[in-house]
Amino acid sequence: MAIPNIVSVSSIYGTTVNSVLTTTLTTTLVTAATDKVHKINLIRCANITDNDATVTFDQEVSGTHKIIANEITVPANSVVDIVDKSNGFYLQETDLIRGGCSAGSTVDCTISYEIMDDA
């Protein structure tokens, strides 16, 4: 298992996943596959209710969890970008992003990223 060299990638695949956040803050949203690097471009939260909610995201690296965003308020019926192109980051192989919300089925989450491979 080697980390791909992003200078000489052989393929880049654009990917988007959508999830409904639950009150379980340990829900895995994205996992980087073995021998791949994921460039996270966007984490967008859309509150689909008439009540404010808070969201929390973390990144797991080699079993250690580090907060990306902690209890960020997503106002009722609005959208908040947690990560965008100006502050994107990389997930190395087997790293993951987890997230949750103060109220289940309140916030829809969109994560857009590129999967890079040097095979």
Where are these regions (language model features)?
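Noncatalytic modules at the cell exterior or secretory-pathway interfaces
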Residues: 88-103
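Short proline/glycine- and polar residue-rich coil/turn motifs
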Residues: 72-80
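C-terminal interaction-tip segments
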Residues: 1-37, 100-119
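A short beta-strand element within beta-rich, extracytoplasmic domains
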Residues: 38-47, 95-99
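Asparagine-centered strand-capping/turn motif at beta-strand->loop junctions
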Residues: 31-32, 44-52, 101
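Short, surface-exposed beta-strand/strand-loop-strand elements in extracellular ectodomains
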Residues: 50-71
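Exposed aromatic-hydrophobic patches
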Residues: 80-87
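Short beta-strand/loop motifs in extracellular/secreted proteins, especially
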Residues: 41, 51-56, 105-109
